[in-house]
Amino acid sequence: MALIQEMSYRIKMSDIDIHPSKTCFLMVSPDYSAVVTQHLSHSLSMDGEIFHIEAVNVPFPDEDSLDYKVDFAEKYIDWARKWDNFVLIEAGVIRGGNYTWITQQMELVSSNKYYTVALCENLGSKFKSDFVTLYYNDAVEDLHFWWEQPNNHWKFDSK
């Protein structure tokens, strides 16, 4: 919870141009990021409004990404018409692949402003988020959240 509180503080102090009436939170990898996104939506609320949240499912390392990319592209077209800004929220950015393809697709479809948030980000990630609470080095330690249980999809090692 302390990392989420720290992220909320950093975003508030940054004075970025977001408001619940014009900004949508994109919960990237809901199975890990739901708790983070929910807390940020409430803690960053303005004028009595919380931020709207949409889920963006992404593949596990052992899955093909094509279906996920097609699904996101179809949904984002509608979201870009409705919202001026987006805040992408991930509990952990390990390699940066998901944020890379998501933001590339967003830029192809619209010029809407977006900000990227990572509660934890690997120093070796190819994607560098706008807001990060904690950096870690996956050569030294694995990223593991207290709520995680063993997941067969992570037995695949693509390093």
Stretch-by-stretch model annotation:
Residues 1-159:
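PRPP-associated nucleotide enzymes
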